[in-house]
Amino acid sequence: MLNIEQIKEIIPHRYPFLLVDKILEVDEGKRAVGIKNVSANEEFFNGHFPDYAVMPGVLIVEALAQVGAVAVLKKEENRGRLAFFAGIDNCRFKKQVRPGDQLRLEVEMTRVRGPIGKGKAIATVDGEVACEAEITFAIGDKKE
């Protein structure tokens, strides 16, 4: 299990864009399972929507990508590098995510070739699928 400080050592995201609270499981380079506790105090709820708060779907996908990044960047040869979003395929939103929900974020790498990889990503709330997608990423370095 990784806490928030350990996650911040692996991925560069910070508030308000760090969308993973803890990692429950990680199999380096293969898969990871994380948690996002969705609080009523999330900044995005101010505008999405003021009278009926719903977590934006793109942020659910971003949270999944961050969990996938932890899995990939935990691998020894990728440490200190960045995982860039390279694509989203077959994305479906099946359940609204509201304040008080706990998102379980699971990403399993299905294919990795060189610096490019694909993963199957599923976000659930109370065992119900909220979002599923295939995410593509590219491993790279910071450019000075």
Swiss-Prot record:
InterPro entries: FabA_FabZ, FabZ, HotDog_dom_sf
Active site: 48
Keywords, ordered alphabetically: Cytoplasm, Lipid A biosynthesis, Lipid biosynthesis, Lipid metabolism, Lyase
EC number: 4.2.1.59
Gene Ontology cellular component terms for the protein in this record: cytoplasm; membrane
Any one GO MF annotation of this record: (3R)-hydroxyacyl-[acyl-carrier-protein] dehydratase activity
Record Pfam families: FabA (PF07977)
Record's catalysed reaction(s): a (3R)-hydroxyacyl-[ACP] = a (2E)-enoyl-[ACP] + H2O
Protein location: Cytoplasm
Residues forming coiled coils: none
Organism domain of life: Bacteria
BP GO terms, sorted: fatty acid biosynthetic process; lipid A biosynthetic process
Family: Belongs to the thioester dehydratase family. FabZ subfamily.
Classification via NCBIfam families: fabZ, PRK00006.1
Function as written in the Swiss-Prot or TrEMBL entry: Involved in unsaturated fatty acids biosynthesis. Catalyzes the dehydration of short chain beta-hydroxyacyl-ACPs and long chain saturated and unsaturated beta-hydroxyacyl-ACPs.
Name of the protein this chain belongs to: 3-hydroxyacyl-[acyl-carrier-protein] dehydratase FabZ
Species per Swiss-Prot/TrEMBL record: Bacillus cereus (strain ATCC 14579 / DSM 31 / CCUG 7414 / JCM 2152 / NBRC 15305 / NCIMB 9373 / NCTC 2599 / NRRL B-3711)
Gene giving rise to this polypeptide: fabZ
